[in-house]
């Protein structure tokens, strides 16, 4: 297949570069910017090539960093007994300041969703630090309030360098069908009962890294068959349509009830599709993350 490109001269501080004034064919977009026009002041070929090479290398390094971030987050979909877990993160820039993680040990699953202040590379680098803290603090005998307190103490020690972090930590016992959680300044996850009732999970404490010695409390609940828990970041709530209206918590709760599916992953994807339809092509202004935890509904034999 023959590809045809429309190319024009490009004005830079060095002068004009790009295709010749006499219509000489340029065979690739790369050549458009490395083939100088016959003008008195043009950048050397090596300078332009080096700049492009650096950008390509940076892109590759950022792509590697994204893969590392995904690897540290654990599986995107997980099953433990009759419990289902699904999570997704979409970065407004290459690296996300939002994070969602699953880690499993036997019949226990630690699920975390949080938001690191800022976006891009700096926030992504701090996630790797937090992942290490979660691994060291996330022992089965630690409840979420104790884990949260340890992480807060560490981030406060690193101030003023460390960012503020909001987080929701949930320790799930898939044998006892219980969730023990701590909400550290994060938007409260939504609990959708099978009968249509909804609750917000607010028990916990302040955001992490802001107040040394802050106290955190754990909440506990049982997830019955057919119940669903939806945790989310502010990027979901603050997603705007073309008129500038925010998606908001009320719309998220109504949508979660409306699109709920038999599987956690299907519920998650339907929710994301609802948010995407609402945005109607508007670009992301913030990172977006979503976690869905669901118990299988009871089935009755005929």
Language-model features, listed with the residues they occupy:
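Short, low-complexity N-terminal regulatory "tails/caps" that precede and couple sensory modules
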Residues: 1-56
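Intrinsic disorder/low-structure terminal segments
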Residues: 9, 29-32, 84, 215, ...
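Compositionally biased, intrinsically disordered low-complexity regions
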Residues: 17-20, 25, 211, 221, ...
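… and, occasionally, acidic/histidine-rich disordered N-termini of signaling adaptors
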Residues: 33, 42-230, 282-302
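C-terminal catalytic subdomain
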Residues: 168, 222-231, 236-302
């Amino acid at each position: 297949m023959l590809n045809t490109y429309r190319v024009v001269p490009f004005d830079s501080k060095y002068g004009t570069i790009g295709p010749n004034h006499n219509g000489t064919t340029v065979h690739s977009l790369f050549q458009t910017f490395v083939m100088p026009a016959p003008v008195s002041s043009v950048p050397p070929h090596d300078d332009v090539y080096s700049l492009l090479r650096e950008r390509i290398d940076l892109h590759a390094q950022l792509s590697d960093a994204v893969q590392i971030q995904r690897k540290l987050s654990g599986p995107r979909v997980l099953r433990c007994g009759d419990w289902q877990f699904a999570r997704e993160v979409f970065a407004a820039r290459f690296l996300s300041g939002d994070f969602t993680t699953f880690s499993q040990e036997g019949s226990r699953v630690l699920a975390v969703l949080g938001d690191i202040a800022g976006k891009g590379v700096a926030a992504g680098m701090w996630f790797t630090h937090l992942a290490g803290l979660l691994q060291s603090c996330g022992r089965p005998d630690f409840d979420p309030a104790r884990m949260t307190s340890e992480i807060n103490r560490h981030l406060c020690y690193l101030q003023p360098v460390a960012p503020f972090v909001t987080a929701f930590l949930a320790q799930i016992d898939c044998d006892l069908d219980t969730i023990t959680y701590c909400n550290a300044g994060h938007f409260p996850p939504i609990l959708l009962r099978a009968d249509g009732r909804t609750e917000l999970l607010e028990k916990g404490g302040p955001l992490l890294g802001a107040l040394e010695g802050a106290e955190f409390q754990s909440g506990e609940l049982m997830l019955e068959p057919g119940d669903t828990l939806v945790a989310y970041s502010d990027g979901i709530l603050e997603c705007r349509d073309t008129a500038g209206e925010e998606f908001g918590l009320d719309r998220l709760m109504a949508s979660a009830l409306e699109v709920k599916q038999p599987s956690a992953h299907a519920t998650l994807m339907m929710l994301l599709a609802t948010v995407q339809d609402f945005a109607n092509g508007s670009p992301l202004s913030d990172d977006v993350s979503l976690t869905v935890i669901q118990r299988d509904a009871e089935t009755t034999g005929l």
